[in-house]
Amino acid sequence: MSIRLENLSYTPGARKEKHRKGRGHAAGKGKQAGRGQSGQKKRSTVRLGFEGGQNPWFRRVPKRGFRNFNKKEYEIFNISDLESRYQDGDTVSLESLYLKKVLKKRNMKAKLLANGDLTKKLTVTTNAFSIAAQKKIEEKGGKIEVR
């Protein structure tokens, strides 16, 4: 007899059937199915956070705080950052701030704060600014534009 595709088969004993536990005495692993005696660990699982009847962590610890979904987040930069990176009469935009590595993220909103001194006339375009920063820029003849 020659070996052909339709004649191929496994060697007897090479492949073993998966043992199906808990399918009756005749199957060899019926009744307790290798799980020991009856109790909580024999059954399925306990729910997440269950501590065996002890008052669980999420009920022991008090509720605290909340997350404000309407909060506006700004990346802040100061007048001192502008002083060191721009020339007199320059226009400061969010894109130029990003390219000069003042802002870390390109599409984030930015707010100008008044830390530092300004000696140059600048036109600044930003999303938000402090009143003190506005005064410092306008004292030197500059402008602030809100984007």
From Swiss-Prot:
Alphabetized Pfam families for the sequence: Ribosomal_L27A
Cellular compartments per GO CC: cytosolic large ribosomal subunit
A biological process from GO: translation
InterPro entries: Ribosomal_uL15 (IPR030878), Ribosomal_uL15/eL18 (IPR021131), Ribosomal_uL15/eL18_sf (IPR036227), Ribosomal_uL15_bac-type (IPR005749), Ribosomal_uL15_CS (IPR001196)
Signal peptide segment: none
Coiled coil: none
Disordered: annotated span: 1-46
SUPFAM superfamilies noted in UniProt: Ribosomal proteins L15p and L18e (SSF52080)
Keywords noted in UniProt: Ribonucleoprotein, Ribosomal protein, RNA-binding, rRNA-binding
Gene Ontology terms, MF aspect: rRNA binding; structural constituent of ribosome
Bias (Basic residues): 16-28
HAMAP family given in the database record: Ribosomal_uL15
Cited function: Binds to the 23S rRNA.
Subunit structure: Part of the 50S ribosomal subunit.
Family of the protein in this entry: Belongs to the universal ribosomal protein uL15 family.
Protein name in UniProt: Large ribosomal subunit protein uL15
Organism: Mesomycoplasma hyopneumoniae (strain J / ATCC 25934 / NCTC 10110)
Taxonomic placement: Bacteria, Bacillati, Mycoplasmatota, Mycoplasmoidales, Metamycoplasmataceae
Gene (UniProt): rplO
